[in-house]
Amino acid sequence: MALFSYKTGVWPISLEIAGARLSLNQDGSVQLQLGATEIGQGADTVFSQMVAETLQTDMAHVHIQTVQDTDVSPFDTGAYASRQSFVTGTAVKHCAEILRDKILAYAKTLLPEVDTRELSLHDNWIWAGEEQAISLAALAEESYYSLTNSSVLTAEVSEQVKKNTIATGCCFAEVEVDIKLGKIKILHIINVHDSGKLLNPQLAEMQVHGGMSMGMGYGISEQLILDEK
């Protein structure tokens, strides 16, 4: 049996900061730029999911730049300490909220007769109350090409996070050991995690599977044998 308590991020030991940049494209899709790095843990999927949920659009309409360039990418301190969903995700959500508000503010200039409080964004449409007013694609095209009311809609944030989340859990493993042969057989494993709200349950489950595999490797002193030739 093994128990764990795991903290997300490194605050207050060190700095936790992340940037995000969003722009509304001409076809109504959005472009997301980050300094955070996708290294196989599913970060890009979660960030795209957060933008899509905030803007009430399809994930297919969120184009994320997965190759970072420190000359132009928003600043981010890196991929470590299981921080990206929590720290960079905070920046992504805030950035998407700003872009959403800018979209609705621009929609108001196209629909002067509608009360701003009645405007909402979902299903790739601007709604006035319960009626579709203008599609997001049409609004985006107008924002780029209007001769009298052009305003390319973008948002950018830099978010410092001064709090952490704590995950806890335990793992039970039943093993069979042949002492004479040194052979180990894993009969049964049970993992129990209290992870809080899961942004993407399938990705979280896969990380548990990965951690379980690593734990088995540590337990039997697994090593990678290299051929120097």
What are the language-model segments listed below?
Residues 1-229:
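Cofactor-binding beta-sheet edge motifs in enzyme active sites
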